[in-house]
Structure formats: structure tokens, C-alpha cells
Amino acid sequence: MMENKRSLLKITQNIQNVTSKLAKLREILDLEMKMIDATELCNQQLVVKFLNSLPQEQGGLIEFVTTHYVYFLFKNCTLSPQFLERGTEHEEVVSKCLHLLKSAVECMSQITSDLFGCQGSGLLSNRNILSELQLFLTWAQNVNRNSTELTSLPTTPVQTFLCAEEIMSLLYLSKLYNTIPSVQFNMPNFQTMGVLEQWTISLYTSTVGLPTGPYQLPNATELACALVSRHADLFISPTHVSQPLLTFPFAKKRANLIFQSYLNNPQASITETGPLVQLREADLQTLDTTFFFLYDYIFEALSNNQAYSCSAATVNNFIARCVDSLTDLGSNLLEASTASRGPSNNIDAFKGFLLRAGLTEKNCSDFKTLLLLNKSNGHTQWKQFPKLLRLVTQLTLTAHYFYACLQQYSPTSLARCKITDTLKMAAAEQMVEYQASGSGKQSKPFEWTIPGILSFFIPQPPTELLQVMSDNISSPYMQSFFWISAHRAWQLKPHTILQRELSPTPLPSSPCNEEDVKKYCREIQVGDTAYQLNIVKCDTFELEFIKTHAFPILQNIFSMDLHIHRAMVQLRWLITFAADAPPFLSTLRKPLILLYFQINDIISQNRVDTSFINMLDYTKDVLTAVQEAVPSAEFSPNLINYLFLTHFSSSLKILMDTVNEFVTETTTVAESVASLARVGATICHSVFSFNTRNDTLEFPIAGENGDEIFQISVPAFKSTVANLQQNCYDVIVLLNESSRELHASYLDLQVISSDIDSMRNHSIKFDHASLNFKGMKDFYIKCFALQNKLASKIANTCCYSLTRRFAPLFEPELISLQTVENILNFSDTVDDPSVFLSGINQPMGCVPPNCQQGAVEKLSKQDVLDIRELAPDFTEGASSAPANATVIKHNFTGTFDKVSIDLDQSSLNTEFTFADKEYNLRTLRQLKLIFLEDLLSNTPQSPPPTDPALTN
């Protein structure tokens, strides 16, 4: 894979300005392994200047470039930055890239026909490559228009070009990523399902575009209407659950989705104090668990040990069915991944099983969040829940990396490098999960690993095509670079491919005088490009050259006696000297070329995860080749130590910056939470009274000259309480986001640590301890512990559940304004008193039993200032209703003239209780009076104000 660009203009100028053959060759070599911007190939004048700058009659590599310039310029041509815009409108990016490549091809066609002609013949000739590029463009345009299949591209040398790989990557992302798999989904009979299950699957299949087979589902809006009107027991007020609202965001979200469907408005949103969806016995008994990942709110409740009113037997049975379904899903995924039907078919089948279970990329992200927020921590009341947790973790991780690989997949070397790195990250994260869930077989829900089951994503190198292309390269030197480039792009093993292919036909050797060979070797200077072919062909010359030049130069390089840039110059000379006189130095030259580019990658900070371990392997190969001539040869570790620090110190710095940023943020959060917790506790435990006439709360403020009264309107106080509690929630969200970033960084640390550990037994020794990655890992673990401890502390503060302390203020009123208006406008002769009963909202749930009351304290003036700093609404002032509001004009008695209203007291399931029950009853009576006064105090031109609680 190419890591950086070179300007064709700059290369051309350098070739024109230098005089030595070695310098010109060096520029060509540099261009050989770097990217060229496609926009430069659209500049006909620039391309012609480059071709005219190539030296004449130099033979070998430059001669091949001169006669095969279309191949040479296009093979490393890149379409970026257009290609890098792949996050924007996708079809537009594909069109831009195709247009750019088409312009470059047209420009080169013009050059070949008008100026340079199409010299030569064969697979890599200018004429054939231009023809193949035209065919490739036609194929890509047809795929983009959906008029041909992705897999219909015929084998062509063009598919190995960087520009073609970039277009293929875009096309595969566009066509594979959002496509519904063409597999049988085996949908159940929806008619036997309950309304909730039908609505869930109807919304899912219509949103994702999943076929439902022969069975038809009712419209999601109709089903939502049925849920809202006939299944009120599905919904529960957030103040009626035993955990704070933040621990049930998905139950809240599910209720919101139902109401959006009900209103047929995807933008609608229920209020903060709106209902949640709860678990029901009948649902858990009948839900089809093969759609497990559609029920995030159920997993959320079970993770928090919350079963609502469901029996333990029902929950246990539901969990057991979920375990069976997810185990089957794991088996199906393994079958989909191992079937030898080609990567596209593997992807189709694998994605089909994920979608059938409801495991879309979005749902995968939601379940990862749920696992992060999981509160059970292994302490659960349901025996099989830990097993379910492990299954969900493994399958969610698998789906996460499946979608990550799907975004990267194409049959290209670009995809191979990215997917290999992604699967290394998957292995690291899976290992972290295994360690977190304990040792032993139990911690592994499946026999397969994520890197193993997703290995079908790794594109295989087109070795047959590469071999044919290699056979069409006449220059041995160019052929060597071709295979080295293939090795770097496709991560080929040098011992299996390069060792066989980098063996050009040797020139016939000639007998030589040994003294002449030694004398000639002594006369050779670093930088010489000319050589005496008759001596270079001698059998003994290579051995003598290694002793007198190669080994001493390599000793100086590895001992760091030379500046690194000077060392690279000498290494480059070793590679290029007499390169077109095989078999001279062929055994040493192969690993030297690989070593050169690997060192260049490291010192240029073009970081690739495998760079350092590859560099060690190439160093070993170089040393082995040198030891054939100098058996006692050894290399100093100085260069390796330097490259180790260069390669990994930047990574360590990034890891340190991440953890330091986390510590700084967490420290700031802890300081702010301390103030927030104190203010929340102050309000929670303060004494106050309720002024029913003014609709205000009155707090006695302790002062030097006795108590003062701080009066605040109920809406302002509710806003204060809600804001303080929301601040707590925001802190938890901030901590979770920081923890997510820290976790991602920790996975990077795991991958790097694993790579370094794998090098400890390498035959090339160096100082592993110069960078303390183990200490860094310990620091990360301490940070995770700190985050968990702080989040737990925040969740246990009064401020975190402050609205529960003042729950009655946030509840809907027991009697609505419409009912009050009906009472005021009641006609003895026309109206039936029984109509009032339908307007009375009976409490729907059970308030948790009163907790033990703590000590109450009076607020101080400083407390008021502290509260106001965090919640500006905490300001003194009475309600907007006038104090002398118009009183009721009707006369009421305790009896009715005709029909009495008989309230069934047993239907009142809930009663909000305070410490003083008499005060509570007195307050409720006064509240009703206030509602009447407010109604009568408004004129018809000014509609009566409504408490938000009445409209929710």
C-alpha cells in the first residue's frame, strides 16, 4: 500500500537538474514506490516533460519505464483527495473519481497517439494498458448505474493499479453496504403474535426494507394506535420505577417510538416526564426470541435486575429461550462464514442472519452502549443471565466488526491491509472481554473467534495475475521492484513468493583472477554507478564485495556511526550498484530493498502496524546473507533501538495524551459533581412549606436575626430540580463518552503490546524496555476503575434522583381543567353528573414505599447562592397568578340535587404520601380550589394557562 505522494513535477525537475546517473536512477526509484496524483496525469504538458527528462540508453529499469510509461505512471496513480471524500454523498464521489480517471486516460491516449506512439507489445504495453483502462472505466460506470454486477470485472492488470483499487473500494462500499441480502429470511406467521410484537417487527421490517415473505403485517401506525388505546399497562411513569430515569433510556426511547408511530410523526418527542415501556408477563411468555436484538429495552431492564411485575419463572424461561436463539445464531453465522461460496456470498448470508435477528449496525451500537451501562456486574437474580450476557457481548462485538469490515471490503490490496488491522483490533477487544468475564471455557460462548469467523473478508492476492505480469517485465531490476511492491501491497510472505520470483536469469559467469577482483573491490567508491561487467560476472566478486563494502557499510549503519539520512543514501547505493548484472548480490539485494523501504516508512512516520516486525525479519534475512560471506558477522542493536523508539514513541505519546486528557476531564467532573451533589442534598433534605394560594414553595432561610422566607414559584422550583438532576445525567453521559474513547485507546494499546510481546523471542535482539507499555496498561486499568467508582458515586447522590424526591410536583393532576370547566358549566336540567367520572385520571401505578426520612435542615443564604449558580431558575418570586384571584361564583354544598357521584375508593391504586398525612389531604383540597380560581381569573380572550404536567 502506498503511504505518501511524490509530485511528478518535482521528480521531473530533479531529473533535469542532476547530472549523475545514480541520482537520476534514485529519482525514478523514489517514484516507483510512491503515489502520483491523478490530476498531474491530466496535464499533458507535464507528462511529456517527464518522459523527455528520462535519460537515454541507460538500460534496465529506465529503459522499461521509457517503453512502458503508461503502466509505470498509472500503477501508483491515486484519485485522492476525491477518494478521501468517501464520507460525503457516495454516488457523487464515485462520479468524481470516474471523471478524473477518464480525463487522465484521455490525456495519456492523446500523448501516445500524437507524440510517443504505442511502442512495444504485450500485456503491459502502452496500447494494451490504455485499452484495459477503457474497459475498466466502462465496467465501473455500468456498476455505478446498476446495469452490471460487481463481480463481473474480468481479470486485468489494471485491477492492481492504485486508482482502480480506489474506485473498486467505492463501488463495493456503495453496492454491498446498503444492500439487503438476497437470502430467505424464514419469517414466522405474524398473525399469531401479540400487538407489541407485531408493531416491533412491522416498524423494523419497513425501516430496514426487510421482506416479510408470504405473511403480511398490519401498518405500524395502526398497531401503535392499538398499543396506546388498548394496552395502557405497557406504559409506566418514570417516577414509578425503582431506578433513576437515566438507567432506562431505551425504555424511554421505545415509548417515544410508539408515540411517533401513533402520531405518524417521526419528529415527535415525549416530554422528560413522559412514560417508559415496561416488561409484561404475557410479552415475555410469547415474544419470538429469534428477534432478540429488537428488544433493547428488555435487555436493559434485565441488566438492571428490573423485572417489574413479571414472575421469576417467566423471566427465567424467557432468558433460556434467548440463550437458545442466540446459540443458534452463532452456529448459523459460523456456517455462513465457512461455506466456500466466495466472499460476496459469505457476506450476503452472514448479513442475512444478522438482520433476521435484528442486529443492524444501529442496533449493534445500541447494544454496545447497553453493555457499557450494564449494572448487573455479574450479580443477577436469574441463573442463566450471565450466559446470556456473554452471548450478547460476543455477537454484538462480532456484528460490530462485521459492519466495520463491510465498510472496508473490496477485492483489493487496500481492503486487505485495512481489514487485517481491523481483525487485529477485534482479537484484542475479544481478549479484553474474555479477561473481564473470567477465565476458563465458560467465558467463551462460542468455539470460534471473531478474527476467524470474519476471515472471509480478507481479499486473497491475485498471485496468478501477478505472475503473468511479472513475466512481462523485461528488466530484472524492475521485476524485483514489482514483487517488492506486491509484497508491500498484499502482505505477501517473502519466503514463499519473493524467494521464488526474484531469481532473474543469471548472466554467464567468466573466469577471473582473484587478485584483480580484490583490487577492483578496493577501488570501488560509495556512489559509483559504472562497473566493469567482466569482473562483476566473476563467481568470487560477490563474496569479496560483501566483505569489503556491504558488511562494513551495514556495520556502520546498524551501529549508528552514520547519520540516518547518510545511512539511507549508502543503503540505496548498495541496492542499485550493478543491479542489472544478475546474479550479482541477488541474495542480499532482495532483503536489502525490503529493509530500505521499511526503514524509510518508520523514519518518515508512515506508520503501518506491521512495519517494525517486518523490519526485524528483513534484518535477519540481510544478516543471514552477509554471514554466508562473513560467518562471524553480527549487527549492533543501536539502529534497531532507534527505530523502535521512532516507531512506537509516537504511539505511546498518543496513548499518554489520551489517558492524561481523561484524567483531566475526570478531575474536572469530580470537582463539579462535588458541588452538584452538595446542592442536590441540600435541597433534598431542606425543610419547606407549600403556599397553596400563591402556588409557591417557601423555604425558611437561617439568618443572624432569625429566619427569613425564601419564596419560589412551583414552575421555577420544578425547573430547578429538573436542571440539577439533568446536570447529573449529563455528567454520567460525559463520563461514558470519555470512557468509550479511553476504551478505544486501550484496544490500540493491547494491539501494540501484543506486537511487542511477539518480538521478544525474535533472533534480532533490541531493548524492549525502553518504552514502558506495561506501565501504561496498568495506568489505563486504574483509570477504568476510577471512572466506574465515580459513576457509581454520582448515581447514589440525592441530586441524581431529585425529581423522585419531589415526585408529586411532576405528576399529572388527578382532576383536569376540562373536568373543572364541566363542573362550573354544569346544568341541573341537562347534564348528567356521571360524565365527570370519565374526566378524572386515576393513578396508574404504585409509588415505591417511602424511604427512611433523613434529617431536614434550613437553607442558608450561601446555599441559595450556590443553588442559583447551578440552576439560574432558583430565584425568589411568587406565581404569576394574582394573589386576589377571582373567587368561584357558584355556590356548592356537600350534596347533589339529583344524582350523587359515587367514587369507588378501591379504584384509587395510588396515593402520594408525605410525612404529614393530614397536611397532604389539606393540600390536595387546596390544590383543587386553586385550579378553579385560575380558571375563573382568565377572560375568554386570554386562554387559561395550563400546567405542563396537565398536558403530558
Curated annotation (Swiss-Prot):
User: Where does this chain mainly localize?
Assistant: virion
Q: Which GO terms describe its biological process?
A: virion assembly
Has UniProt tagged this entry with the keyword Secreted?
Answer: no
Spell out the residue ranges making up region: Interaction with large tegument protein.
Answer: 490-952
Complexes and interactors: Interacts (via C-terminus) with the large tegument protein/LTP (via N-terminus).
Q: What does this protein do?
A: Plays an essential role in cytoplasmic secondary envelopment during viral egress. Interacts with the capsid via the large tegument protein/LTP and participates in its transport to the host trans-Golgi network (TGN) where secondary envelopment occurs. Modulates tegumentation and capsid accumulation at the viral assembly complex.
Family as reported in the entry's similarity comment: Belongs to the herpesviridae inner tegument protein family.
Task: Return the protein name.
Answer: Inner tegument protein
